[in-house]
Amino acid sequence: MGSLRILGVDPGYGIVGIGIIEVSGNRISHVFHGTIETPKNLPAEKRLKRIYEEFLKVLERFSPDECAMEKLFFVKNVTTAIGVGEARGVLFLALAEKNIPVFEYAPNEVKVSLSGYGRASKKQIQENVKRFLNLSEIPRPDDAADALAIAWCHALQSRARRVTHEKD
């Protein structure tokens, strides 16, 4: 079996977390992590355009096979939810243009896959990302670490789906 390049995305309006890993057999390795940031003083349409254009550059540079994105699960602030929803829209558009399938995960699913516990702390998840990917330090900012965690979750979930499918 060949390798699988997974793009993890922690969607946001101000900061989009990006994490890319490669799965080859039983080995999962770190490829890249970073963020796409938009200044608060830019109008909404320019912020969304920047997210879209920068995200397309990531897709073209790293050619992921699949994308794992955090679901918009629960937010306390409606304004924040609207901005994140708009950002998700342009991210989905870019992924659709490149024919990259998207898999969505709730935050507690990501936590369970990295810690075995759906209410693990952010710090615990970040430490596990560092350890599992053999990184010298926790990826910064938090959004990038979260994106790597989402990618890791998908790697485990897709492996489980393949094993289940092979048994059928």
Curated annotation (Swiss-Prot):
<feature type="binding site">
    <location>
        <position position="143"/>
    </location>
    <ligand>
        <name>Mg(2+) 1</name>
    </ligand>
</feature>
<dbReference type="GO" id="GO:0006310">
    <property type="term" value="P:DNA recombination"/>
</dbReference>
<dbReference type="GO" id="GO:0003677">
    <property type="term" value="F:DNA binding"/>
</dbReference>
<comment type="subunit">
    <text>Homodimer which binds Holliday junction (HJ) DNA. The HJ becomes 2-fold symmetrical on binding to RuvC with unstacked arms; it has a different conformation from HJ DNA in complex with RuvA. In the full resolvosome a probable DNA-RuvA(4)-RuvB(12)-RuvC(2) complex forms which resolves the HJ.</text>
</comment>
<comment type="similarity">
    <text>Belongs to the RuvC family.</text>
</comment>
<dbReference type="GO" id="GO:0005737">
    <property type="term" value="C:cytoplasm"/>
</dbReference>
<feature type="active site">
    <location>
        <position position="10"/>
    </location>
</feature>
<keyword id="KW-0255">Endonuclease</keyword>
<keyword id="KW-0227">DNA damage</keyword>
<comment type="function">
    <text>The RuvA-RuvB-RuvC complex processes Holliday junction (HJ) DNA during genetic recombination and DNA repair. Endonuclease that resolves HJ intermediates. Cleaves cruciform DNA by making single-stranded nicks across the HJ at symmetrical positions within the homologous arms, yielding a 5'-phosphate and a 3'-hydroxyl group; requires a central core of homology in the junction. The consensus cleavage sequence is 5'-(A/T)TT(C/G)-3'. Cleavage occurs on the 3'-side of the TT dinucleotide at the point of strand exchange.</text>
</comment>
<keyword id="KW-0238">DNA-binding</keyword>
<keyword id="KW-0460">Magnesium</keyword>
<keyword id="KW-0233">DNA recombination</keyword>
<feature type="active site">
    <location>
        <position position="70"/>
    </location>
</feature>
<dbReference type="InterPro" id="IPR020563">
    <property type="entry name" value="X-over_junc_endoDNase_Mg_BS"/>
</dbReference>
<feature type="binding site">
    <location>
        <position position="70"/>
    </location>
    <ligand>
        <name>Mg(2+) 2</name>
    </ligand>
</feature>
<keyword id="KW-0479">Metal-binding</keyword>
<dbReference type="InterPro" id="IPR012337">
    <property type="entry name" value="RNaseH-like_sf"/>
</dbReference>
<keyword id="KW-0540">Nuclease</keyword>
<protein>
    <recommendedName>
        <fullName>Crossover junction endodeoxyribonuclease RuvC</fullName>
        <ecNumber>3.1.21.10</ecNumber>
    </recommendedName>
</protein>
<dbReference type="Pfam" id="PF02075">
    <property type="entry name" value="RuvC"/>
</dbReference>
<dbReference type="GO" id="GO:0048476">
    <property type="term" value="C:Holliday junction resolvase complex"/>
</dbReference>
<dbReference type="InterPro" id="IPR036397">
    <property type="entry name" value="RNaseH_sf"/>
</dbReference>
<dbReference type="GO" id="GO:0008821">
    <property type="term" value="F:crossover junction DNA endonuclease activity"/>
</dbReference>
<dbReference type="GO" id="GO:0006281">
    <property type="term" value="P:DNA repair"/>
</dbReference>
<dbReference type="InterPro" id="IPR002176">
    <property type="entry name" value="X-over_junc_endoDNase_RuvC"/>
</dbReference>
<keyword id="KW-0234">DNA repair</keyword>
<feature type="active site">
    <location>
        <position position="143"/>
    </location>
</feature>
<keyword id="KW-0378">Hydrolase</keyword>
<feature type="binding site">
    <location>
        <position position="10"/>
    </location>
    <ligand>
        <name>Mg(2+) 1</name>
    </ligand>
</feature>
<dbReference type="GO" id="GO:0000287">
    <property type="term" value="F:magnesium ion binding"/>
</dbReference>
<keyword id="KW-0963">Cytoplasm</keyword>
